[in-house]
């Protein structure tokens, strides 16, 4: 029944295309995928980048892992199967957003290499920018903004990534960020790579990039 139903679904083509939206927006669309441990600084960097892009009239949207878990994926647990489904759903939403001509920032742990590989394949290599926010576990645990590491050490959480659950470090991320350096410098690196890939035009970055 399920397979027969899928045969009756036909993707509808629209006259307003991604290319037309990008031309109107004045920039290309892309997914910037921030991966790293809880407390690594993914959301802070993603938020900083979005703020700069927004201030300069680029169309953006930030998909934060906790926000998605509270809404679209509120029915999912933290089992491996549900973690994979969580990432798949975020990937599908991201795919729609790049078709809308938006620069999509995704801040989510996404601990498994296979997950991230599938998203890259789903979106297409040129549409996916993997950013590894590389912060040592001990620093993440010292920060512990959500008290997750504390709960994990007390046995109140049994599946925290980096403690009981594996985090697979990206082997060849598009950008490797050290979160222990300044937020401004990391944000500037991201602006530079977006310019290098011709996603955006940001003249005189070093002179105008002040915040």
From Swiss-Prot:
Pfam families: APS_kinase. It catalyses: adenosine 5'-phosphosulfate + ATP = 3'-phosphoadenylyl sulfate + ADP + H(+). It comes from the Bacteria. GO terms for biological process: hydrogen sulfide biosynthetic process; sulfate assimilation. Pathway: Sulfur metabolism; hydrogen sulfide biosynthesis; sulfite from sulfate: step 2/3. Keywords: ATP-binding, Kinase, Nucleotide-binding, Phosphoprotein, Transferase. Gene3D superfamilies: P-loop containing nucleotide triphosphate hydrolases. Coiled coil: none annotated. Its EC number is 2.7.1.25. Disulfide bonds: none annotated. InterPro entries: APS_kinase, P-loop_NTPase. The keyword ATP-binding applies. The keyword Phosphoprotein applies. GO terms for molecular function: adenylylsulfate kinase activity; ATP binding. ATP binds at residues 36-43. The active site is at residue 110. Belongs to the APS kinase family. NCBIfam families: apsK, PRK03846.1. Catalyzes the synthesis of activated sulfate. This is Adenylyl-sulfate kinase. The gene is cysC.
